[in-house]
């Protein structure tokens, strides 16, 4: 079974949120078998900055769904969207 790299856009619920703390909470929320291979930050608007973690997950049924759900449950996250997916 191969692996998939997915860039996921995580929007915080406030421009005042501490992005370093949010990044740490996202790392701790990962389901088993998934790992983060780096973060990018994207200035959206009005001081709001999105986090863009690249997540490596096994290439099986469900794909990034478990990661999206776990990120969505993290305190301070407004929305989660997959931006890009590719096999590695």
From Swiss-Prot:
SUPFAM superfamilies in the record: eEF-1beta-like
TM helices/strands, residue ranges: none
A matching Pfam family: EF1_GNE
Signal peptide stretch: none
Keywords from the UniProt entry: Elongation factor, Protein biosynthesis
Name under which the protein is recorded: Elongation factor 1-beta
Gene (UniProt): ef1b
Function as written in the Swiss-Prot or TrEMBL entry: Promotes the exchange of GDP for GTP in EF-1-alpha/GDP, thus allowing the regeneration of EF-1-alpha/GTP that could then be used to form the ternary complex EF-1-alpha/GTP/AAtRNA.
UniProt lineage: Archaea, Methanobacteriati, Methanobacteriota, Stenosarchaea group, Halobacteria
Presence of keyword S-adenosyl-L-methionine: no
Any one GO molecular-function label of the UniProt entry: translation elongation factor activity
UniProt similarity note: Belongs to the EF-1-beta/EF-1-delta family.
PANTHER family to which the protein is assigned, alphabetical: ELONGATION FACTOR 1-BETA
């Amino acid at each position: 079974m191969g692996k998939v790299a997915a860039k996921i856009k995580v929007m915080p619920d406030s421009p005042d949120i501490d992005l370093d703390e949010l990044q740490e909470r996202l790392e701790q929320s990962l389901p088993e078998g998934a790992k983060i291979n780096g973060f990018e930050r994207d200035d959206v608007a009005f001081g709001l900055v999105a986090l863009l973690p690249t997540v490596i997950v096994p290439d099986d049924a469900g794909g990034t769904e478990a990661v999206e759900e776990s990120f969505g449950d993290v305190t301070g996250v407004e929305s989660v969207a997959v931006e890009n997916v590719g096999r590695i």
